[in-house]
Amino acid sequence: MSRRGTAEEKTAKSDPIYRNRLVNMLVNRILKHGKKSLAYQIIYRAVKKIQQKTETNPLSVLRQAIRGVTPDIAVKARRVGGSTHQVPIEIGSTQGKALAIRWLLAASRKRPGRNMAFKLSSELVDAAKGSGDAIRKKEETHRMAEANRAFAHFR
């Protein structure tokens, strides 16, 4: 039996300008080689572009995009009797948001375009409208989970 106590769950900090945890999560995921100031620049430029494109509150567009891409269920590889099955599992809200952010950034990196801020803003606007690569990834994950529903008892 372990003598160590359980670790406290860390809460995500909020960013300096918008005081929003989602923006901070996005910054931490877009971060490369420790260049956090560049990550903040990219995010804030993307938010400005969203403001120009939609003429609505950019944070509500961001929230709507992340809510639209967040998966409810995913598949996890589980080895049972020599064969690997894709077992559908439910996803918690924090893990779902993290996955959604990862998918949004991956989809925006794939996009053709000038710079990351432009590509990210385009992907976020598309995701808020219900289209784009990140939404397609979510639907594909849900389809995989539905197809492998028979293996749900392997959890």
Curated annotation (Swiss-Prot):
Its main location: plastid. GO terms for molecular function: rRNA binding; structural constituent of ribosome. It is found in: Plastid, Chloroplast. GO terms for biological process: translation. The keyword RNA-binding applies. InterPro entries: Ribosomal_uS7, Ribosomal_uS7_bac/org-type, Ribosomal_uS7_CS, Ribosomal_uS7_dom, Ribosomal_uS7_dom_sf. Keywords: Chloroplast, Plastid, Ribonucleoprotein, Ribosomal protein, RNA-binding, rRNA-binding. One of the primary rRNA binding proteins, it binds directly to 16S rRNA where it nucleates assembly of the head domain of the 30S subunit. This is Small ribosomal subunit protein uS7cz/uS7cy. It comes from Daucus carota.
